[in-house]
Amino acid sequence: EVLSINCSYSKEGKYPSHNLISKQHRPKSKLVINSSRGEVIDYSEIVNTSIVFNDVWTNEPKISPSDIFSFLDNSNAFGTPHIAGYTFSSKERQIDLILKKFNDIFSKSVERKEHKKLKRLSSCLPEKLTNSKNLDFKSIILEVLSTRKISVEFKALLYEFKRAGKSFGSKDFEKLRKSKMRQGFDDICIDLPMDKQLLEKMELSGFQKYEK
């Protein structure tokens, strides 16, 4: 039903991933999610037979706005500006890796002074949902991260540039991407009552247990 692509990109070697998913290698999946590299799938072709959610684009950051706009103009197409892993927690993990490398190279034991602060789930949801006795997984996820909304905003911005006769360049793409830095699921703690089944789904998705 769902094909999620997370591989590295290569044009050579025994198993090149360039155009791994294409007209010649069309997936049977109803939904294709690409968060690897834009060149891994021919998204303009695959969107004709599958719902495609694309987070990465050909020739980033020197993208082709017209190609992306044409892709997003399909009813089966959704796209975001390379933000799949663009969270505060991922940045913190990068800092931890850099700090570890520094300590290893210079035989130091420098520690971070700042510690990760979790955001409460209740602060991410509207009041009508936090007060609901029937919380459901889909409603929570759509409130915490509405990728569909981001896709609509992305397309609208491309259209705005096009209408104004301006070129949407690499700097504009990076500016948009940086504006979408967000709380990852692992940055959020569960502080609302919910049944065991829902709690398990939330924790499997990365949400943290609330500790008083």
What are these regions (language model features)?
Residues 69-87:
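Short FAD-binding loop at a beta-strand-to-alpha-helix junction that anchors the flavin cofactor
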Residues 1-69:
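Rossmann-like adenosine-cofactor binding region
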Residues 12-14, 86-89:
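A generic structural signal for short coil/turn motifs at secondary-structure boundaries
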Residues 63-64, 75, 88-212:
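NAD(P)-dependent dehydrogenase/reductase Rossmann-like domain
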Residues 4, 70-72, 96-98:
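Short, hinge-like loop/turn segments at secondary-structure boundaries
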Residues 9-11, 56, 77-81, 102-107:
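Glycine-rich loops and low-complexity Gly/Arg-rich segments
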